[in-house]
Amino acid sequence: MKMTRKISWTLLLAAAVSFTQCKDAGDDVQIDDENELITSVTLKFTEEGTNNTTSFSYKDADGDGGNAPARFDTIALKPNKTYTLAIELLDESKTPASNITDEVAEESDEHLFVYTPAPSTLLTYTYGDKDANNYVIGLTGKAVTTVAGTGTLKVRLRHQPGTKNGTPSPGSDDVNLDFILKVQ
Amino acid sequence: MNRIVFVFLLLIAALTAHAQTSECACFVKGVVKDQHTGQPIIGATVLIVGQNSGVFTDEYGRYELRNLCPGAYTLECRIIGYNPFREKLDLTAGHEENFNLLEQEVHLKDVEITAHRTDAPSSQPLSTISGSDLDRTRGQNLAESLKGFTGVTSLQTGSSISKPVIHGLHSNRILIMNNGVRQEGQQWGSEHAPEIDPFIATRLSVVKGAAGVRYGSDAIGGVILVEPEELPFDKSLSGEVNAVGFTNGRQGVLSGTLQGGIKGFKGFGWRAQGTMKRGGNIRTPDYFLDNTGISEKNFSLAAGYRNKGLGIDVFYSRFDTKIGIFSGSHIGSVTDLLSVIENGEPFVKSGFSYNIARPNQNVSHELIKAETHYHFQNGNRFQWTIARQLNDRNEFDLHRPRNDSIAALNHPELTFKLTTLTNDVIWDHKPIAGKLAGQLGISTLYQYNLMDGRPLIPNFNQFNMGLFWMERYVKSGWELEAGMRYDYRTLTSFRIVNREKVSQDFKFSNFSGTLGATRNFSEKFSARLNFGTAWRAPNVSELFSDGVHHGAAAFEKGDATLQPEKALNTIASLKYASPKFTAELGGYYNIISDFIYLKPQPEPILTVRGAFPYFKYTQTDATFKGIDLSASWEFARYTTVTSKLSYLRVYDTRNDNYLVMIPSNRIDNQIKYELPEDAKWHKAYFSIGNLFVAQQKRVPPASDFLAPPSAYSLWNVQTGTTFDLSEKQQLEIGISVQNLFNVSYRDYLNRFRYYADDMGRNVSLRLKWKFGA
């Protein structure tokens, strides 16, 4: 009887010791790694027939939160001109910066860029590329300006895995920015 | 009315009987004997079937029935332990009839009286479900199983994830004690359900109100106790199998328990238990919810040893779940959210499938516990519990990485590994003068969290120590209780800020106290009053959140300067219980100073996905006051009506406003008809009920994208019975229908109310096969 009690106490103590194999959370801090973070969006307008390219960017180097966006350019274009519009997405939180544009191109059947000017008379956008399913993408296209005026250009990247059907409705926003657009 | 007719009939009967006395001089007499032994049977009943006359046999087994009119009679003789015997007689004069009864094989079941040790404060309302009431909730998750209590609701993320809400408080403000160990998971997230298999428990109890002294930090809103049955020491093998099927989600749940002692090893008991669950897409009245399946595999093992005053228990459990998150709830920006709200139903449509795709979460929780106690001869008692928990949570986003080679690895986008070691030592001192009993305890907790993936909350180490002392005084009808506690907590967080490791230290300490009284006016009527304080240190998500909460379309920011919340809870209740009528009325008033909540900021915050509403963790003072009323009345034979009412009002006193996400008031009515017992089946019942949930009208203006959903009313029906298959085997069957009329509704505390309706009609069939002692 005495024996069993002794044994049980020993067992319990042994269990208690084995429980104390503590670890320190501080030894194991991983660099935060957000998959597919987009920190900068650049619109490159090249005037047709020339090599004049003007770039307008949105930049938030540390992603959501932290510091406020460092740059949010106003798009300035000339009236009655035709531009080639290319878009570039980067993740500059990593070194070297990773090019998200390439990855969007790779998975073009899941992505759709949507350019919406307001008022709509400011600019007309025509898609210049198509994916394997013959749906437009929007990595490159044409933008035609008309009369002078001021408004916004909403740039959206719709992520539509498995649901892309050529319309903006399915999926969710990866990018949703309202650039100020001045045609003057 | 019935009573008057009855009295009238009785009078007529008496009159006619009187009128006949002159001619009715017949009698029957005789002796009742045991058929085998020939011994007279004393105290047997001999009665005339169909009349209200009967006599008992005397010490010689004799009986005599006098003043009978001539005619045909059926005589019955019966006594417990013998088969009843009937005889037909034609009486004209006196008659002698002897009975020889045959002994009956009647084995009365052993009556077992078990007492449970519940450490909950005695002056606070403690509600418990067990037995057949608990069986009726089988197959549901923990929070759903608790919804039958007044004052308890649930916070849901769709139909598969829900967590309990007591008096409007949830998550880290509710403490769950799983088999005597405080459940430590990632409780801060509203989509993080408690990782507990309700099949482990044979009793679920809720302590409403602050219970900070006994349980320490976090028990501001209340405590949920999940308790298994006592281990079967020195008993033969027994067990049960539960099978539950639900039509909605075509969900099946199978759970089994096997337990017993060991022959030749006195004082030993063991139990093994396992549960499997599989469900597919949930259906609202009008459409399926894509990717809302669930798959769960849990098991537990327990063993124990008892010898005189010594007891040792070891317990291991593993909970493993994979839950699909409704894909229609995935939004990238506020524009996405607003368009879903405008659409009124999800854009993503699907049929039925068991497949669980992204987004989903895989969570496992492992608990290993060892407990020992020793009762000293003089009445002192010592108890020591150590436990280790590992909570492993993996969340998979809808979108895989764009980079194909990384995507192929199929890693979770977010991983948390939380390890917790707890250690509790409790000393119950011997009762002083038979009136004063108390306990002294120390509990420690060491915890570390490792996370990986999308930045959300930091890694941290946490250490807690609490010291408490409680005394209870019992004297003729009065029970008084007082206690105090001191807690000390350190927290060190580790984050990467601009590629540098930054650590930050926090120290919190707090005193809490409790004071309560119970007065038993009579056996039926009692009253309780309790004042209790509790506290809660801010958790890491409140201190460090910084980013978009995609499920809520909100940018949430923590505040590292937050101070602990402190609650003062006053709770009073009156209880009346008689066989036909029981009622309990409780009122509470809970003041929480420095209540931590998300305060909407005037300016939205700009991200690459657009501008998001900006919320900051802020502190205020809040009051929670409410009434819980439950009553049950057997108004007619076998028929009982039960009503439960929960009423709650919450106010932000510092800002003179209401608070968000407070459950709305509700009333639940059930009427139940229990069939009289039969030899073959028993506990047969049929019930019909209605739950009415009011609209939450007390919300701060402009605090939400959508006004709280309107009121709803749901009907349900249930029926069930128990069969004795053999002496040691029982089969219990239950059928129930929830949301009988397939009503479309949305609940204010369901986070998916922006996207879709709640669950439609759900029929369930429940079988329980119980065998062994």
Predicted regions located by residue number:
Chain A
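Helix-rich interaction surfaces within compact, conserved domain-sized segments
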Residues: 115-184
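Short, solvent-exposed beta-strand/turn "edge" segments of beta-rich domains on protein surfaces
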Residues: 31-34, 72-79, 170
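Sec-dependent bacterial lipoprotein signal peptides
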Residues: 1-21
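Bacterial Sec-dependent N-terminal signal peptides
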Residues: 17-43
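Short beta-strand segments enriched for Tyr within beta-sheet-rich domains
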Residues: 81-85
